[in-house]
Amino acid sequence: MYLSEIKLWNFRKYGIKDGVAFDKAAPALDVHFHNGVNVLIGENDSGKTTIIDAIRYVLHTKSGEPIYIDEKDFYKSKETNSQRTRQLKIECFFDGINDDDAALFLEWLGVKNTGDGKKNFILKVCLSAKRMDDGRIIPHFYAGIGGEGNSMSYEARNYLNVVYLKPLRDALQDMTHGYKSRLAQILQAHSVFSDSNKDSDGKHQLETDYNNLKAKVDGYFNKDGKQDGGKITKALNTTLTEKFLLQSDNKNAVIQLTGSELSDILRQLDLVMEDNKSGLGSLNLLCMAAELLLFSEKMRGLKLTLVEELEAHLHPQLQLRLIDYLESKGEYGQFILTTHSITLGSTIPLKKLLILKDEEVFPMDEDATCCTEFDYRFLQRFLDATKANLFFAKGLILVEGDAENLLIPTIAKIIGKDLHEYGVSIVNVGSTAYKRYVNIFRRKDKKHFNMPISIITDLDVRSIEYYEDPDNKGRKEVYRVTEETKKDLNAYKD
């Protein structure tokens, strides 16, 4: 089971066409995904986070952090004095539903014909919201193929929860003890700490062991006890009663381990890699490893992991190792990643990329581009990190070799048209295989990529080769062929 499509109406930057009634409007954005790894790639503010957040708003996350629609989620036109829209809607469609998954969502499923005589289950869930005059926002979640659908039970909706790794992760805070510890949320969502692993009294083994330890620690500091810790507690209470508290106050201070419930225990835990303080890169890997615990745990229902800015705090070699791991896990579930890393852009197979540009999403698979299978193979070999900046450019100049690569930026700067100021990238193809790169931007759906592309090559005139022959020893008689001499030659045919 995987997320195959998402549609947006009036969500953030994706607004429907003016003058069209909301209930009759086509979606402002329609994105198709495939099972396995999908990578949203594009420049800053191109809409990557908007798509990820839309998925989170509808499906919620496995860790259970609160997610609310606010006023700024409603589309606002860039025109002067425009107002935010009153309604928004997000629809998610799911495909690849097997019989086990179908049993979880039976009353909300639909059926579609595949064209080969077979039928597949499909599931649609929708989140809509209205913004009221008094500032309230009224959300409505429903599921089903036709019309407004039906409400979905809390239990069924939990099977659609996703694993989410947020951008610019504060890995140190997330993996450190505290009331808002992300590590505690992850552990509590793990099956090891589910109700099925508790005894008849509703106690987990960890709670029992912790409470035994707590009794010993608390006893050590008991003011009525005979251990050294009791002397400290007794001295504290003596100071309080004799120096600070009123005579009528009847209070005692104690030193103890706090909390006895499982949630309290998990909030006291840290995830560390080594005794010394780790760098941001190592902490980030720890954070992702912890988050992916939930991915491997979730056996039934949707297995979807959202990762924003996979490259955060990681050097290129670790980025490559991480993406290799995620690709290896792709057959067991779905990953939707965002990035603006040229390292990842050049490493991930082109078919798995979705380029975001100008309120549009351009899939790079064979159903969308004019690339042939040979083009894909060629680009997988030769589209390296120095060429992958074409995914982020406002304009593109493809050049044949090093000479053009050096001269063109210099000439542009001399005439006052610095290419960097205009977001124009130069890609040194290193050959005459321009068409393979251009086919990335040629679309079968005829959508315009809205990016000017130029191809600059040289004439490649061969230099005249000669050698000295003063004695004319190498002279050869050459018969010049013209229209007239052709007639003479034809006369000698047998």
Predicted regions and their residues:
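Conserved nucleotide-binding/hydrolysis micro-motifs of P-loop NTPases
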Residues: K13, F94-D100, R131-D134, R169-L172, ...
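Conserved P-loop NTP-binding catalytic core
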Residues: I52-D116
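Short glycine-/polar-rich loops that comprise or flank the Walker A/P-loop
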Residues: T85-I90, F121-V125, N158-V162, G301-L302, ...
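Acidic, divalent-metal-binding catalytic cores of TOPRIM
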Residues: L354-D494
